[in-house]
Amino acid sequence: METPTPRVKPGFNGVGVGMGSSVNGSSRRAGYYMGPAGAVAVAGGGRAAAAAPVDGCSVALRVFVLAATLVSAVVMGVDRQTSTIRITVTDALPPLEVPLTANWSYSSAFVYFVVANAMVCLFSAAALAACRSRAAMVPVMVGDLLALALLYSAVGAAAEFGILGERGNSHVRWPKVCNVYGRFCERAMAAVIVSLIAAFANLVLLMLNILTIHKSSSYY
């Protein structure tokens, strides 16, 4: 009987333990690898499929992005206000009172904002479900990059339209409307701010994912 010869193999963090032995001419190998997700057993001469390392901070950020984008999409999606506008036709006639409605769907920027936040919310839910799959790490990272670009573009478009409604544009004689639709503008502003915070959280999440893939690259 041969004496078992220990073999050390690198794991995710360069730390691993292996044991090989040969009995009656047959070779057997067993061991385990230590990584961020714990010990991964390997036996029978093969390598077990390792689960992706799960970072609690990344999961918390993912849940926050999901919740924040959901809130932003819902708040903007129900934003609507009807106000009575006085219109003077001639000085000889009393002003006419006309009810006018401001709705988020009347602005293409706000429509894009709602759709973008809804898409990022759905992607965050799918990424949470796939967070333990090592094969999904790179696709999720690419998705995070696209989600980040989508959020920032949506926030920029909605913020620009909101500033136009708040201040108007004297160069083209566009009057401000937030003095008439105050509640509508406040809700839109709140949705944009929450979505901007979600975009920052998504940026941090993307950086953490890149760092995780870099640390575990020695496994391959």
UniProtKB/Swiss-Prot annotation:
Keyword match Membrane? yes
Q: Which residues are glycosylated?
A: N103
| Disulphide bonds in the chain | none
User: What's the protein's topology in the membrane?
Assistant: Multi-pass membrane protein
Query: Record's GO cellular component, any one?
Result: plasma membrane
Q: Which family does it belong to?
A: Belongs to the Casparian strip membrane proteins (CASP) family.
Subunit structure, as described in the record: Homodimer and heterodimers.
Q: What is this protein called?
A: CASP-like protein 1E1
